[in-house]
């Protein structure tokens, strides 16, 4: 089943329990390799990217058990340091295994990762930092070969706060001699979650925010850790509730991780209330909010740009989006136009003039968050829409269809 059929026009009403974050679970799974012990991750989302990460761990020799939202990994039996191209192609975050492989085995053979096509998204910062730590890395076409006689501590100053590079260097530093000082590190909550897990395993990681010090060579143990709630899943459902003029309450949510998104929604006329660990959004009239500029945390997240654009397509007034992190991140715009949205996009900017009503259309998702935007657009459109390419959505949203149906959406999968 890979097509969603959506009949729009029904406001979303209900309660949604958020899953563990995709962007936290994937680096956590890579981190289990570095421990050489048994680890348990609770509230791990049932998404295809997690399945792909578990397949990589099994290929490397780890024992992996998946039961509901619990993933147990025993990496004591890991015996390989190569990842075949067919596994690497399944997700962008597969490159996060490079650091722990070097830390654990001193060698790694892999290829450039897959995942969503969002422009260049180079891994140069990963490789540059690892080379500075003593790794010899060659890149032959799409093949990456890495070797080291022993990583060593040093100071790495990232030219920009790359999330992936920060995670990879933290994981590599677990096996280095001395201390890695990481400057201009990314500050996303998912990195804080990774550090909390590693500290529970015994890692010596000091500092917080953009300056981190990781002392390598410290013996690690296993740990049980609950994955951080998914703030991008939260942003998506909040945008859907706003677009359909609904009333939705999120549970298992961390509002403090959504500051920039909540500010935009409040500016757009949504009523937001927080109580007892829950976040409620009510919307009867949606106004344009902007300009919306994507930025590293704690700015407006690039992963929320597409879902919010779908909501602004049916808001009163004009909203300007400025995408500052990734090129090629307006690939959802043609599909929203097919629904009747008035959007002009050029280079880093998209100008959205809200319309009173969208109409059904046939669309194909080309990436995870763009696919979410298409679902939101279809939910508030008159008539029926069909969305193909839903495998992209299954990479990052667990139980999307039943969750929306429970809130009153007319959505089926075939």
Language-model segment annotations:
Residues 1-414:
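Short, structured segments at the rim of ligand-binding sites
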């Amino acid at each position: 089943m890979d097509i969603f059929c959506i009949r729009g026009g029904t406001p979303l009403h209900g309660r949604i329990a958020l899953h563990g974050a995709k962007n936290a679970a994937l680096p956590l799974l890579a981190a289990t390799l570095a421990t050489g012990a048994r680890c348990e991750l609770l509230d791990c989302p049932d998404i295809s990217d997690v399945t792909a990460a578990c397949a990589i761990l099994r290929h490397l020799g780890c024992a992996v058990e998946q039961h509901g939202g619990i993933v147990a990994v025993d990496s004591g039996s890991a015996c390989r340091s190569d990842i075949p191209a067919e596994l690497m192609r399944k997700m962008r975050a597969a490159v996060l295994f490079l650091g722990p492989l070097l830390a654990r085995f001193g060698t790694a053979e892999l290829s450039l990762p897959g995942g969503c096509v969002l422009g260049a998204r180079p891994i140069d910062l990963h490789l540059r930092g690892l080379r500075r730590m003593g790794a010899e890395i060659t890149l032959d076409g799409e093949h990456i070969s890495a070797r080291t006689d022993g990583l060593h501590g040093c100071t790495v100053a990232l030219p920009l706060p790359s999330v992936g590079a920060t995670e990879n260097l933290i994981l590599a530093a677990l096996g280095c001699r001395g201390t890695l000082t990481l400057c201009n590190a990314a500050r996303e909550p998912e990195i804080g979650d990774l550090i909390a897990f590693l500290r529970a395993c015994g890692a010596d990681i000091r500092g917080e925010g953009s300056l981190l010090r990781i002392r390598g060579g410290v013996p690690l143990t296993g740990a049980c850790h609950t994955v951080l709630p998914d703030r991008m899943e939260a942003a998506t459902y909040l945008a859907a509730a706003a677009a359909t003029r609904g009333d939705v309450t999120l549970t298992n949510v961390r509002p403090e991780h959504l500051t920039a998104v909540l500010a935009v929604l409040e500016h757009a006329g949504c009523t937001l209330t927080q109580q007892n660990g829950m976040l409620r959004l009510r919307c009867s009239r949606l106004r344009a909010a902007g300009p919306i500029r994507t930025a590293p945390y704690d700015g407006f997240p690039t992963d929320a740009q597409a879902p919010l654009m779908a909501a602004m397509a049916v808001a009163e007034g004009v909203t300007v989006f400025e995408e500052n992190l990734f090129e090629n991140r307006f690939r959802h715009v043609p599909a929203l136009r097919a629904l009747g949205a008035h959007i002009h996009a050029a280079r880093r900017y998209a100008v959205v003039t809200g319309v009173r009503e969208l109409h059904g259309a046939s669309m194909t998702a080309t990436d995870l968050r763009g696919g979410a935007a298409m679902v939101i657009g279809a939910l508030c459109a008159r008539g029926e829409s069909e969305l193909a390419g839903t495998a992209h959505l299954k990479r990052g949203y667990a139980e999307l269809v039943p969750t929306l149906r429970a809130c009153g959406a007319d959505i089926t999968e075939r």
